[in-house]
Amino acid sequence: MDPKEKEKMAEELNVEETKDTAEEQPQDDQAEEAAPLTHEEQLEKELEDAQAVIEEQKDKYLRLSAEFDNYRKRTMKEKAELILNGGEKSISSILPVIDDFERAIKTMETAKDVKAVKEGVELIYNKFMAVMAQNGVKVIETKDQPLDTDYHEAIAVIPAPSEEQKGKILDCVQTGYTLNDKVIRHAKVVVGE
């Protein structure tokens, strides 16, 4: 071979070797990057991960706390509205009875037939008691009933006209009422002894 050709081939080999070493260097850098983390680096990564989890849990807690606070405020508002407007249904059902009473009062001023006025008042009373029953109010029975201190309050004791009426209610001075089976006013009664 010609010395020129030898030189040329030698140069080509040098160029190829330079390329090979240049290609190997980045691989060495990549190998270093892919190398396992040191103990210190691993601990730092775990710490960062733990802090991220803590931040996430803290955010969830704050959101849940705010949601519960809003729920509490909303239920308090609803409860206050129920207390203020709870009797609205009952009052609304009584209003027609009040209208009937107003008409009866006007009629009484000019009426000459007392019997008709009495019948009108009795009709209004019956209508009112029906409205009360619709709202859960019931009259406590007293006639010929034995004294029951859960429902009755004995305000007087008198001698019983017969042996069968001893310990029983002879007269009701004031009617008692229950609301949804809870006594709201005891019946005031006279008992035989």
UniProtKB/Swiss-Prot annotation:
Residues 1-22 have a biased composition (Basic and acidic residues). Gene3D superfamilies: 3.90.20.20, Head domain of nucleotide exchange factor GrpE (2.30.22.10). It is found in: Cytoplasm. Residues 23-32 have a biased composition (Acidic residues). Keywords: Chaperone, Cytoplasm, Stress response. The keyword Transmembrane helix does not apply. One of its GO terms (cellular component) is cytoplasm. Its main location: cytoplasm. Homodimer. This is Protein GrpE. It comes from Bacteroides thetaiotaomicron (strain ATCC 29148 / DSM 2079 / JCM 5827 / CCUG 10774 / NCTC 10582 / VPI-5482 / E50). The lineage of its organism: Bacteria, Pseudomonadati, Bacteroidota, Bacteroidia, Bacteroidales. The gene is grpE.
